[in-house]
């Protein structure tokens, strides 16, 4: 029974350490991204103008095929 308890404790401890490691890596990634975004915003003196507005092109009309099923073109 002591061996099962020992294995269970080791498993839970390993899972906890894995979770802690993953969460710290995610936190570091977010911190780096935020720092990069803040530095990028500091370098920009004024926002760039929005892209020009494009009008929507009309859809292309494709006539239905004149060939019948089972017959050639």
Swiss-Prot record:
Tissue: Mostly expressed in seedlings shoots and leaves, and, to a lower extent, in roots, stems, siliques, seeds and flowers.
GO biological process terms, semicolon-separated: defense response; defense response to bacterium; response to bacterium; response to cold; response to ethylene; response to jasmonic acid; response to salicylic acid; response to salt stress
UniProt key word Secreted: yes
Protein induction: Induced by cold, drought and salt stress, but repressed by pathogenic bacteria Pseudomonas syringae pv. tomato (Pst) DC3000, jasmonate (MeJA), ethylene (ET) and salicylic acid (SA), mainly in shoots.
Signal peptide: 1-31
GO molecular function per UniProt: LRR domain binding; receptor serine/threonine kinase binding
Outcome of gene disruption: Slightly increased growth and fresh weight.
Keywords: Apoplast, Cell membrane, Cleavage on pair of basic residues, Membrane, Secreted, Signal
Motif placement: SCOOP motif: 59-73
Keyword Signal set for record: yes
Motif SxS motif essential for MIK2 binding positions after renumbering to this chain: 65-67
Region (Disordered): 44-73
SUBUNIT field: Interacts with MIK2 (via extracellular leucine-rich repeat domain); this interaction triggers the formation of complex between MIK2 and the BAK1/SERK3 and SERK4 coreceptors, and subsequent BAK1 activation by phosphorylation.
Family in the record: Belongs to the serine rich endogenous peptide (SCOOP) phytocytokine family.
Official protein name in the record: Serine rich endogenous peptide 14
């Amino acid at each position: 029974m002591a061996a099962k308890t020992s294995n269970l404790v080791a498993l839970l401890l390993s899972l906890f350490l894995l979770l802690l490691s993953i969460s710290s890596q995610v936190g570091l990634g977010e911190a780096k991204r935020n720092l990069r975004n803040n530095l990028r915003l500091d370098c920009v003196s004024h926002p760039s103008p929005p892209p020009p507005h494009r009008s929507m092109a009309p859809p292309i009309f494709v006539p239905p095929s004149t060939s019948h099923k089972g017959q050639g073109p």
